[in-house]
Amino acid sequence: MIRLFAVIIVLLPRLVWASDGSCERIVSLAPSVTEVLYDVDLGERVVGVTRYCRYPEAAQKLPKIGGFYDMSVESIVALKPTLVVALAEHESVRRSLENLGVSTLAVDHTTPKGIKESFQKLGARCGVETEAAARVEALERREAALRFADRVVPPLRALVVVGRANEGSPTSSIYVSGNDGFYSGILELLGVLNVNNDATMTLPTLSPEGLLALKPDVILEVVGKDDPAVTTDRKQLWARYPQLPAVRNNRILVVDYRFWVE
């Protein structure tokens, strides 16, 4: 208890600046949050990000506060933020920061609706309503274009791969988006079914038999950047399974993970 009290006393002078909730010094707790901040011209106010925040390039040069699951409250506090922007999944970290007097803002990036609302929240909080409104309008135009695109009946079935631990195998340690993820919202707009009706999961090994059982009509690979070499590599990996409807009909789509907001 005495040690905790001593730590609080040391931190108190640093926390005076956190009470007004301004946006002069912002720390981002997720790559998607960092992108939104830069999209509404708040990039110059960002003073800390996670080690996974790679876009835009300027964010890579900022101090790091940890990763998605190993964030350091001490590192965040040391940056003297006037606002910390977190995802809903960061509730425990957010509570710790609030208890120390650090202002936070939670946003939801699991759905297209949540992303639009995050622009609006940041716009209102940080006085960039015009920039935020422009981004929301652009997203709504994109939604409308998807919603009114020609639908296929019966609907296509899509396998959405959002990451992979083994770049040399199409079926080893892949991360598959489920019904709880952002991409399910996109598929719904398109009138496409997700072959994974469960939560987003890691598949340590997806056997050829298991893959064939899923019968995806479309395979959507989400990658870190738009690179023709990566696109070619992914398509060559999946070409090993010509029995799949998606491969047979050349429906392997490789997209930059920012395709929705650009």
Please give the residue ranges for each predicted region.
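Positively charged n-region of N-terminal signal peptides that target proteins for export
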Residues: M1-L4
